[in-house]
Every structure is written in structure tokens, then in C-alpha cells.
Design a protein with these regions (language model features):
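M16 family metallopeptidases and their MPP-like homologs
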Residues: 1-7, 13-44, 61-69, 120-136, ...
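Glycine-centered hinge/linker elements that transmit conformational signals in sensory
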Residues: 80-94
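Short beta-strand/turn micro-motifs at beta-sheet edges
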Residues: 52-55, 110-114, 168-174
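Non-catalytic, conformational "gating/processing" segments within enzyme and secreted inhibitor domains
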Residues: 48-84
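His/Glu-based metal-binding/catalytic segments typifying zinc-dependent metallopeptidases
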Residues: 93-151, 155
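Short helix/loop capping segments that flank catalytic or ligand/cofactor-binding pockets
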Residues: 76-77, 89, 133-136
Length: 195
């Protein structure tokens, strides 16, 4: 049932585009490419290994971080914590990460993806690289994405009328290494894609 559902998802041009771009940028690296499994992935899944990994990861909640959102009193939070968190197993392990050394493509690249019959194109411009992480710079990058989204909508949609919508987003990541990413994306008609 899930295989057929995922096959239907993969038939959607937008999803196919995202997967192709991800595979192109990250060289089909399973740790960085799209999490959408193919039919071959489903056929090759080792369910026992997946279940064993699940059990191993959730056998120790001592280094988990919990975030609670909602309108609760301190007393309610205490009751919920005692009921749901205090009973979780704890082995006092400290989790860490491992930088595998993998990095995505750098430099300038162009990738064209064709899928579907609609007279529609999606343009994505991406920038990425290594940098020193800071909370301040991360907030600045996110703000830049928000501001650029407003400007893109003003210029491309409202003034030129050549796109249906536009968006930009940026962020810095601390782990597994200091990096930044910034992307601009918008759907348009094929004639306007190279403008």
C-alpha cells in the first residue's frame, strides 16, 4: 500500500523535481538526498534492522531534548512530565554526531528537469558553502530570506506578472560542520524561466 502511495507521490512533477535536484546536489548520497523511498528502496528494506535500530535509539532517553508548546500550567506540566517522561529509560549515554566529511557540490551548476505535461516551469537558484556558525548570522540569513521573498513577489509577480509566487530562504547550520544555504525558488511559465 505504501509503495503505491509513494509511486503516486513520485509521479508529481514538483516532487520529482525536488528529488532530482537533491540527487544532483548531493550525488545520490543516502544521508543527504531526498527521504522519498523508491520502489527498489522498499524492496531492499531490512525491516528487522530498522526495528532493531528503533529499539536501540529509544532505549535511552537520557540525552533527549523535549520541547513543550501549549497553554499548560506549571502543575499540569509537572504531572505530564512525571507521567510521560519520568518512566522513559535512561542509560546516561551522551549522544554525539560524526562528520563523515561529505560535502555537497560547490561552484556554479545548471540542471534541467523535465516531467509532466503542464506548461509550467520551476526555477531554483541555490547557494551553499562552509562558514562559521553564529546565532546572530543565522537570524540575519533567515531575515534576508523573508525580505527577499517580499521583494521577489513585488517585482516578479506584481510588476512583471511572470511568476505565480516566489520565495527565498536562508539558514546557517552548526552541525555536522558550519555551513550556509540560501535558495530562491519560483514557479513560472517555461518562456520566463531563463529571464
Amino acid at each position: 500500500k505504501t509503495k503505491s502511495y509513494m509511486a503516486n507521490i513520485m509521479a508529481m512533477p514538483e516532487v520529482f523535481f525536488q528529488l532530482e535536484v537533491s540527487n544532483f546536489m548531493y550525488g545520490h548520497n543516502a544521508r543527504y538526498s531526498s527521504p522519498i523511498p523508491t520502489e527498489k528502496d522498499w524492496d531492499n528494506t531490512d525491516y528487522k534492522k530498522a526495528y532493531d535500530l528503533f529499539k536501540e535509539r529509544f532505549a535511552d532517553a537520557s540525552d533527549f531534548e523535549f520541547f513543550f508548546v501549549g497553554n499548560v500550567t506549571d502543575e499540569q506540566m509537572k504531572t505530564f512530565s512525571e507521567k510521560y517522561l519520568a518512566s522513559l529509560p535512561a542509560l546516561n549515554r551522551k549522544e554525539t554526531f560524526k562528520d563523515t566529511g561529505f560535502r555537497g557540490k560547490d561552484g556554479v551548476h545548471k540542471k534541467e528537469v523535465f516531467k509532466g505535461n503542464d506548461d509550467k516551469a520551476t526555477v531554483r537558484i541555490s547557494y551553499a558553502g562552509e562558514t562559521t556558525y553564529s546565532v546572530k548570522e543565522n537570524l540575519a540569513m533567515q531575515a534576508l530570506g523573508e525580505i527577499l521573498t517580499i521583494k521577489l513577489i513585488e517585482e516578479l509577480r506584481e510588476k512583471e506578472g511572470g511568476v505565480y509566487g516566489a520565495g527565498a530562504r536562508g539558514s546557517l547550520n552548526k552541525l555536522p560542520y558550519g555551513s550556509y544555504s540560501f535558495s530562491i525558488s519560483y514557479p513560472t511559465n517555461p518562456a520566463s524561466a531563463d529571464k
